[in-house]
């Protein structure tokens, strides 16, 4: 987000070019018509989604999945691994969505429409009481690694960060949720907050895929 923002805010998109149909949600023409001529007003992040807010109370949501990367480029790129290209109006260059695995997806939504965001739990920074995690985890026999990856409980941790959080907390990824003590949940939350905060600050492992 930080890397994209200076080069993207204030730009107006011309008609998107879609190379991989499943890279967008919904009809192609609806997406193209909705994005064409719209100006970027701001960017934000929610869980593992990047949000690009447009000037007509709509927003683009990008879920990059495992290999998706967003770049602002100076000229139209080669088609190799390109899923979606949003050219800038009146100038060369645009926003390029590269995805070697082709799992990433973009949504065009009204600003008030939560779409897939409605299924997300709070981010680590929004959780003030570790008992929230304790209550969620204590009824599950799933391994703690799987529970950390469950975005409906706590949003924002992917595979790499979940491993880092568990390592920092000295907890086995295979430990069932119901075996966690309250103190374990407090340590997990503290480390999740710290690791995600550092990742965002330094454009860390997964966040770096935004630039």
Where are these predicted regions, by residue range?
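Structured catalytic/nucleic-acid-binding cores of DNA maintenance enzymes
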Residues: 1-211
